[in-house]
Amino acid sequence: MEFSELIRTGQAQAELLRGPEMPPLRGTLCVTGHHLLLSPGPQATPDLWLLLLRNVDSIEKRGQGTLSLSLSIPSVAGDAGTITLRCKDLRVLQLDIEGVEATLDIARSIEALSSLESVITSFPFFYRPKGLRLGEAWHFHPPERYYKRIARETWSSPLPVPQTRAWRLSEANEDFSLCPSYPRAVIVPRAVDDDALARSARFRQGGRFPVLSYYHAPRGTVLLRSSQPLTGPQKLRCAADEELLRAVLAEARPGARGFIVDTRSAQAAKQARMTGGGTEAKAAYPGWKRLHRPLERGRPLQESFVCLMEACGDPEQSMDRWLSRLDGCRWLSHVKEALSTACLAAQGMEWEGACILVHGAEGTDSTLLVTSLAQLILDPLSRTMAGFQELIEQEWIQAGHPFQLRCAHSAFSHTHPKHEAPIFLLFLDCVWQLGRQFPLSLEFGEGMLLALFDHSYASPFGTFLCNSEKERCLCEVRTRTHSLWSGLNQPKEQRKLRNPLYVPNPLAIWPSVEPQSLRLWQGLFLRWTHPPEPSEVAWEKVWQIATDQKTEGSQPTDSASEPQP
């Protein structure tokens, strides 16, 4: 199929309204296979306005007939139409276009081009920026890199030798036959062979058998993730699965115990058993205790996101109405529960010296939310720029979060939600809360989090394409597209992404989850409705102050790194 077949009208005269306190742009509007472009006239600024069509979440079109638009160019003020584009990055754009027929044709073209489902026809497969080479920055291989890090840490560990060399890198999933959503290599107990892994995979939903997510060197404990066991109504058991979790405790240290953090409610887990799922039986997994910490996912979380954006987009509501709607959408409640569950897992490892297994049902959503946040709390390396990028690769991209499904639509789509859910956005919001409470402990700033949000929904890079590593291999994403990290790590981008106040903090950071401690992330949810200039000026001032301090040889210190009551 040629893109030209979907373009009914290629260009028209138009005016673009972008938001408050932003001047309108007037010129020639052009539709291409992947972009919407507005080329200003010769008397205007030479800047070219560009919108990736994949960024369009919903489109509303109105034929105006003889409507007198609020335009200063007479060529558009008569027979005209209006297109309102609501974008996945939460922008709302209005295009006033000359000619009703041209308006409707352009709207239909945008609808068709923005909803193409084929991965290999998406823009990342055509994007060839200057200064970047294909294959560059696709060198992140978290299982291999992380295994080497564990080896270094265990060799220097004061724990007994037999208990610290207890993990191995398994390539049993080399052809993705064990688990299509896992990477080719995973870290598992050395005492468990690949045959046992295969049997355990058949006992777990989607083949997601327990694998190591994080090794906490100071206490010699581990964080694992998996999917639910397929016990079913008959309460089935799997000797290999039991052996795997028994080996985890045996190889941690003598007398070690474990906690299974189930991100479903006890009632939901019980209902799952009726459809073939279930939980680990106490008798079958001695030494492991199950804790239920329900986290919303799927449609309830998507509806919460939609309600929040509806409230943020209403400029005429009263203070009481705003506070009521903010409370009613329950978004900050989801943030609180996610951080609380991550703190529970981190406390179990740090304070109790316990091993932690996290799973829900599929193990690809709230499970990854908890394991990644727990690592940020405990691991200083995850709070560096490079470490955070590796965390995203390890715990989200290669761990099988289905970005293509979850980020198919944002908050404005008119279609009934199917697989969409802002799980990754919830993670980014939680990280923003950590950065706000510990302003010196993260090497990356809000700009990095905003960039990750934008690129997860629509990007010229291939990093967030597809739903699993298997799909990315089939589509040759790593050889035919550019990595997002290659773009973000360019020197000219780093000033916008880094935290100028960062000071390495070797301690765990324990966030407060009290209601008064959590804030609405205005930099994301209100960034297109509030003028950006004040925050941009403040950011540049912070950079200037931090640079002056470093020049004078003084550095700030972060005093908020101890657990809060």
Spell out what each predicted region is.
Residues 2-82, 87-92, 96-100:
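Phosphoinositide-binding peripheral membrane targeting modules
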Residues 38, 376, 398:
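Active-site micro-motifs of SAM-dependent methyltransferase domains
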Residues 44, 49-52, 65, 71-84, ...:
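Conserved N-terminal structural segment that caps and organizes enzyme catalytic cores in eukaryotes
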